[in-house]
Regions:
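A polyanion-binding, active-site-adjacent surface
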Residues: 1-193
């Protein structure tokens, strides 16, 4: 799923249109939640799917998990406007269930085109759904978190989803360790430019 020459994030949004490609369109979606942020971002965050707050506002990570993500971004010296934030799926599954692999497969090509356009230096995958869809691995987040992985020459850092951290705050320390690795890598590559 390669982007076309000169394609922009807005072009992808237009291609998605008023999407009816999978059952999520009719299951409880109010708004399609598109990837948002800096199209020249060096850092991208990818989550699972919108929740109720995101569905209502049409923006990714705006609920309690989003507030925590904002704090994580600020803790590594960046602002939300500096990064790109999206999800594997753009429509909310009913009752916040995990999207099926078939639903994810329909949305995933749009995410991969966005990554190909922006080419962020680091992609932080938040939780198992993002991990499994970007890296095509069956390993769980607990096993691979904190280790840089490769996606087409880009660094990928798997870590816990902020919603999980709200349920289990004891994992915040590990997430902070992961994010320090991201910060240090971005600082190092910036110094080398």
């Amino acid at each position: 799923s390669l982007p076309r020459e000169g394609e922009t994030l807005e072009d992808i949004r237009a291609d998605i249109g008023d999407c009816m490609r999978c059952p999520l369109c009719c299951e409880g979606r109010t708004k399609i939640v598109h990837t948002e942020g800096n199209p020249q971002a060096r850092l991208m965050f990818v989550g699972e799917a919108p929740g109720a707050n995101e569905d209502a506002e049409g923006r990714p990570f705006v609920g309690r998990a989003g507030q925590l993500l904002n704090k994580i971004i600020e803790a590594i010296g960046l602002k939300r406007e500096d990064v790109l934030i999206g999800n594997v799926n753009r429509c909310r599954p009913a009752n916040n269930r995990t999207p099926t692999s078939a639903e994810a497969a329909i949305c995933k090509p749009f995410l991969l085109r966005e990554i190909a356009i922006v080419r962020p230096e680091v992609i932080v995958v938040l939780g198992n759904t993002a991990l499994h869809n970007l890296l095509d691995t069956k390993e769980g987040i607990t096993k691979v978190r904190g280790q840089f992985k490769d996606y087409k020459g880009l660094k990928v850092m798997p870590t816990f989803h902020p919603a999980y951290l709200l349920r289990d705050p004891s994992k915040k320390r590990e997430t902070w360790d992961d994010m320090k690795k991201v910060r240090d890598y971005l600082n190092k590559t910036k110094a080398e430019r």
